[in-house]
Design a protein with these regions (language model features):
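Canonical Radical SAM [4Fe-4S] cluster-binding loop centered on the CxxxCxxC motif
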Residues: 121-158, 209
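Conserved AdoMet/S-adenosylmethionine-binding subsite of the radical SAM
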Residues: 161-171, 184-329
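Conserved, mostly hydrophobic/aromatic
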Residues: 72, 135, 139, 297
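Short, charged beta->alpha transition segments
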Residues: 114-117, 127-130, 161-166
Length: 444
């Protein structure tokens, strides 16, 4: 801690000779003094780039802007910066200019699933609500590089109102995830207004906020902000720690403020080559998170966004990490490893296989140690065979309006109230031949 305090003092004076640690801990001062130029980065860190390196770095930040908070900059180990996980996540890399054929600006088709500006509606009962295009730091692995830093603004109330109107007019939406950019870039007053408007919508049960502020600018988690959030429970917060070194004294204090206010905390890590692609490191991270009352939620496979190929690991590395966690640490410390499907397919869990085989009588399983065991299936199970008619159900679900739910995908095939028996991909040649033959038979 003393090492960081000394570094904070040193950086504060380099940035502003009249400033002190009180200024340093002011989140607005941090934003005003964010590092956006290579020359400023060199001055503050002592790291020097030669002319050729500087030229290509300038080209990189011209396409993907640079912005690092002084706080996050202070965590960089300058003696080994090329291998430093803080540096790799925050500073420009010329490899970002390399765009592979399979990479896309919007690989998750968030814009295509946007019924009104600011809303992405992909899953039946929840929406993503973009309320900011601004971040305190531009993470180099960001899946929304097409937005963040390109059009730098916080939407006006009339723009946000379009999203609120859509949510209000869509009764199926029970869960709203506020995202961006970073929602905590908004003023307390503006955020309070948005939360108040959402709480007026009767069918909105849960509000979630995705923010990396506890990681890159923990001073933003002020008592005033926490007081605003407490007014609107249930509010959940997901943050984005990728490496154990990000859990500093300051970040832990920020997390404690939120947890003490009764706000459930989750964490979404991204698997990044050269940053956290190590089973021991990931185990350390999830255990430290749980110790600080943060539930590891997702471990994301790096998306197919443009310029991220140097960050991507094989999926096998993620499986290896999951093998090292499941059974080897507490169950609530283990995140779900997911691939966010290109084209807007949503998050797909990708986990080690523990179900080896099964028959009508037995299931063959293996555990984390490699022990193979059997589980005896029940002999007299009376399957109620759900037909979707909850009024006749004996399982006490009448109050839950479950009959209004629509089955999709594999669940649709398993359901007893839908006559669908197969799902066919688009552009299936066999189906097209069938249709062509049927059309031909109808002609004389």
């Amino acid at each position: 801690m003393e090492n960081y305090r000394s570094r904070h003092n040193e950086l504060t004076k380099k940035i502003d000779s009249e400033a002190n640690l009180t200024n340093w801990q002011d989140w607005k001062w941090q934003l005003r003094n964010s590092i956006q130029k290579i020359s400023t980065f060199e001055t503050l860190t002592g790291i020097r780039f030669d002319a050729e390196e500087r030229k290509i770095l300038e080209q990189t930040i011209e396409k993907f802007p640079l912005s690092i908070t002084p706080y996050y900059l202070s965590l960089i180990e300058t003696n080994d910066y090329k291998n430093d996980p803080i540096y790799l996540q925050s500073f420009a890399d010329p490899r970002e200019l390399i765009v592979q054929d399979w990479e896309q600006a919007d690989p998750l088709s968030e814009d295509e699933d946007s019924p009104v500006p600011g809303i992405t509606h992909r899953y039946p009962d929840r929406v993503l609500f973009h309320i900011s295009n601004v971040c305190s730091m531009y993470c180099r692995h960001c899946t929304r590089k097409r937005k963040v830093g390109d059009i730098d603004f916080i939407p006006a109330k009339d723009q946000v109102q379009q999203g609120l109107d859509y949510i209000r007019a869509t009764p199926k939406v029970r869960d709203v995830l506020l995202s961006g950019g970073d929602p905590f870039m908004l003023s307390d007053e503006y955020l309070d207004w948005i939360l108040t408007e959402l709480r007026k919508i009767e069918h909105v049960e849960v509000i979630r906020i995705g923010s990396r502020m506890p990681v890159v600018l923990p001073y933003r988690i002020t008592d005033e902000l926490v007081a605003v959030l407490k007014k609107h429970h249930p509010v959940w917060i997901n943050t984005h720690f990728n490496h154990p070194r990000e859990l500093t004294t300051s970040s832990r204090k920020a997390l404690a403020k939120l947890a003490d206010a009764g706000i459930p905390l989750g964490n979404q890590s991204v698997l990044l080559a050269g940053v956290n692609d190590c089973p021991r490191l990931m185990k350390s991270l999830v255990q430290k998170l749980v110790y600080n009352r943060v539930r590891p939620y997702y471990l994301y496979q790096c998306d197919l966004s443009e310029g991220l190929s140097h960050f991507r690991t094989p999926v096998g590395k993620g499986i290896e990490i999951m093998e090292s966690l499941i059974g080897h640490t507490s169950g609530f410390s283990v995140p779900t490893y997911v691939i966010d499907a290109p084209g807007g397919g949503g998050k797909i869990p990708v986990m080690p296989n523990y179900l080896l085989s099964w028959s009508p009588h037995k299931v063959i399983l293996r555990n984390f140690e490699g022990v193979i065991t059997t589980y005896q299936e029940p002999e007299n199970y009376d399957d109620p065979g759900c037909d979707g008619d909850c009024d006749k159900c004996t399982l006490q679900l009448k109050f839950d309006d479950a009959h209004e739910y629509n089955s999709v995908g594999i669940w649709k095939l398993l359901s007893n109230w839908d006559e669908t028996y197969s799902l066919t991909p688009e552009n299936n040649e066999r189906m097209e031949r069938r249709e062509g033959a049927a059309d031909g038979m109808g002609q004389d």
